[in-house]
Amino acid sequence: LTAVLKADAYGXGIGL
């Protein structure tokens, strides 16, 4: 995963 996806996962709760 990219840092952007990780940040989105932590921030939005997607869990990617």
From Swiss-Prot:
The keyword Zinc-finger does not apply. The modification N6-(pyridoxal phosphate)lysine is found at residue 6. The active site is at 6 (proton acceptor). Its EC number is 5.1.1.-. The keyword Isomerase applies. GO terms for molecular function: isomerase activity. Keywords: Isomerase, Pyridoxal phosphate. Its cofactor is pyridoxal 5'-phosphate. It comes from the Bacteria. Disulfide bonds: none annotated. Belongs to the alanine racemase family. This is Broad specificity amino acid racemase. It comes from Pseudomonas putida.
